[in-house]
Amino acid sequence: MLNSKEFVRELQLRHESAWMNPNVGSADAALTALPLTRADVDDAEARLERFAPFIKKVFSETAADRGLIESPLTEIENMRAWLNENKGAQLAGKLFLKRDSDLPVAGSVKARGGCYAVLKHTEDLALANRLVEMRDDYSVFATRAFRNFFSQYELHVGSTGNLGLSIGIMGAALGYRVTVHMSADARQWKKDLLRAKGVTVLEYGADYSYAVQKGRERAAEDPRSYFIDDENSVDLFLGYAVAARRLKAQLAEQDVTVDDEHPLLVYIPCGVGGAPGGICFGLKQEFGDAAHVYFAEPVEAPCMLLGLASGLQNAICVQDIGLTGRTAADGLAVSRPSGFVGETVKEMVGGGFTVSDEHLFTDLHALHETERLFVEPSACAGFAGAVELSKMTDYLESSGLGAHWENAAHIVWATGGALVPEGEREKYLAN
């Protein structure tokens, strides 16, 4: 295993590499030290339940789940066999795909945090203006009167693509004026889709951090504007954390036991850190020390792992060590991590892995061939973590995971893909 200094050197050399967090402690100790609690996740979950009648009414694809924005958990045995045979993995137990790539509304994990942050702000405005009480039927938010009210307000967000889609789609459905500040990495089809929804898209020839800053500045100019801050938002974070509760129920439905002798290993693609950080926080609340969470990032944009391993959090960016921040995994093309997330998960996340664009496309193609499932390149990052961890016999032995490896459940969190146009899908699969 590499120590933190050696790992940063490997990052500089653009090598695919692994870092195991030396600071990870017990879940109870880590959670107790945080200002956020289970009650905060309870509050977020209840708010999503209140808005379910509105979501069901406006987004018909959520009807089967009664207006909840949720995705399937699918066992991918054929992909597990392929990884073992073709990549030298030693994955025992079961391998699942958490298909946030197919989340309704926005087709990515950002439909969790992004939509929740919009709904939280919406409820705050509605309560402050005495438009509703919490016991009311929230389907009224779909009426013309409510849309007219929210058209007085504007939402701003900086994004590489998927967060902008979730906030743009949900915000427009509620009647807001929405401006998405897009970095140079954003895909054209995502910009086109937002504009088709009536969203204003401002494009910048710079990276994600610059787009976020511009969004923050524009929102500050107007008291009726609200900036959804991907770098520092507690609301986004809690929206993602709710996912762990629903995952717990899905695992129970599939008779998957999670305890000390049946560990749960979760591999999550990471950009600025909000989604994987919130999910990690939620998983530790639900499963404690039986949950082992690992982040996966591109070799050119490993911002969160760089911040964690160096201990500098958001005081360092990937350009500081000679990397570009540019990657085909547009959702992960982030140069500087969230300091809020880094500080929150620094004693919870088990570690992380970096992956080349080439291997993202290899795994994208293999998943489609073995399971007939399509995800976008960013969503494939977790496979590298599952493969590499399975080969780390020293770490598995020292961590105690090796003793229960045959009983483990592995989840690769697929973060996006459903909205990718057919022409783009064909290009990805041909790559």
Q: Each predicted region: which residue ranges?
A:
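PLP-dependent amino-acid enzyme catalytic core
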Residues: 1-431
